[in-house]
Amino acid sequence: MATWNNLNLQNGASPLMEQIIFFHDHTLIILIMITILVGYLMINLFFNKYINRFLLEGQMIELIWTILPAITLIFIALPSLRLLYLLDELNNPLITLKSIGHQWYWSYEYSDFNNIQFDSYMIPSKEMKFNEFRLLDVDNRIILPMNNQIRIMVTATDVIHSWTVPSLGVKIDANPGRLNQTNFFINRPGLFYGQCSEICGANHSFMPIVIESISINNFIKWINNYSS
C-alpha cells in the first residue's frame, strides 16, 4: 500500500506489476536523456553569438532529427506493446473470483465453490481497531492463495465502478450489463489495498478493496471453514 510521503509507485506484489515498474523506469531514463539534450541545445542557441546568414538548408541535420525520434519511439513502444498483451493474457487460472460493484460497496463470489459469497463494506472510523487503516479496511477481506493464477471477473449493478489494486497492477472497469475479466498472480503473502477508481457518486471514496494473500493450505482451510 502507499505509505506516508511516498512519491514512488507501490512495491510490486505480482510479476506484472514488477514489469510495469521496470517499464516506467526504462521510459523515465529515455525522457531524462531527451530533456537534457533539448535543454543543452536551447541554452546553446540562446547564449551564443554565431550567425549564419547563408544557411538555407541542412539535409543531414534534418535527417538526424527525423530518424532519432523514430528510433526512440520504437524503444518505448515495443516494451509497452508487450505489457499490453500480457495484461490480456489468461494462463489457466486456478480460481475465478467475481466482483460486483454497488453504490457503495463490493460483492464477491467464488465461482469454483458452492455458497461462498459475501459483501465487503468499508469499516467506519468509529468502529475501527487500533491496527486498521482509515478509509481502507473492510469488514470482509478477499482471501486468495499466493503463487497461483487468479482470474477476476468484474461487473456492476448500478453505475460504472473500477476495481483497482495498485500493488498487483490491476485496474479493470465494472460496467453494468457487461462482464470484464483480467488475471493476476500474487507472489508473496500479505494485505494489499485498493479502491474504486471511477467516480461513482457521493460515497465513491468509501469503496475500499482488501486482498489477504495466504498459502494454498491455509486457503483450503478457509474454504472448508466458510463452507461449513
Curated annotation (Swiss-Prot):
Swiss-Prot/TrEMBL keywords: Copper, Electron transport, Magnesium, Membrane, Metal-binding, Mitochondrion, Mitochondrion inner membrane, Respiratory chain, Translocase, Transmembrane, Transmembrane helix, Transport
Localization annotation: Mitochondrion inner membrane
Binding site for Cu cation A2: C196, E198, C200, H204
Listed GO CC annotations: mitochondrial inner membrane
GO biological process, one term: ATP synthesis coupled electron transport
Catalytic activity field: 4 Fe(II)-[cytochrome c] + O2 + 8 H(+)(in) = 4 Fe(III)-[cytochrome c] + 2 H2O + 4 H(+)(out)
Xref: Pfam families: COX2, COX2_TM
InterPro entries: CcO_II, CcO_II-like_C, CcO_II_C, Copper_CuA, Cupredoxin, Cyt_c_oxidase_su2, Cyt_c_oxidase_su2_TM_dom, Cyt_c_oxidase_su2_TM_sf
E.C. designation(s): 7.1.1.9
SS bonds (residue pairs): none
GO function term, MF aspect, one: copper ion binding
Annotated residues for binding of Mg(2+): E198
Keyword Transport: yes
Binding site for Cu cation A1: H161, C196, C200, M207
Note on cofactor: Binds a dinuclear copper A center per subunit.
Mitochondrial intermembrane-side positions: 1-26, 83-228
PROSITE patterns: COX2, COX2_CUA, COX2_TM
Mitochondrial matrix side: 49-62
UniProt entry tagged with the keyword Manganese: no
Cofactor needs: Cu cation
Superkingdom: Eukaryota
Transmembrane segments: 27-48, 63-82
Oligomeric form and interacting partners: Component of the cytochrome c oxidase (complex IV, CIV), a multisubunit enzyme composed of a catalytic core of 3 subunits and several supernumerary subunits. The complex exists as a monomer or a dimer and forms supercomplexes (SCs) in the inner mitochondrial membrane with ubiquinol-cytochrome c oxidoreductase (cytochrome b-c1 complex, complex III, CIII).
Role, per record: Component of the cytochrome c oxidase, the last enzyme in the mitochondrial electron transport chain which drives oxidative phosphorylation. The respiratory chain contains 3 multisubunit complexes succinate dehydrogenase (complex II, CII), ubiquinol-cytochrome c oxidoreductase (cytochrome b-c1 complex, complex III, CIII) and cytochrome c oxidase (complex IV, CIV), that cooperate to transfer electrons derived from NADH and succinate to molecular oxygen, creating an electrochemical gradient over the inner membrane that drives transmembrane transport and the ATP synthase.
Protein name: Cytochrome c oxidase subunit 2
Encoding gene (name): COII
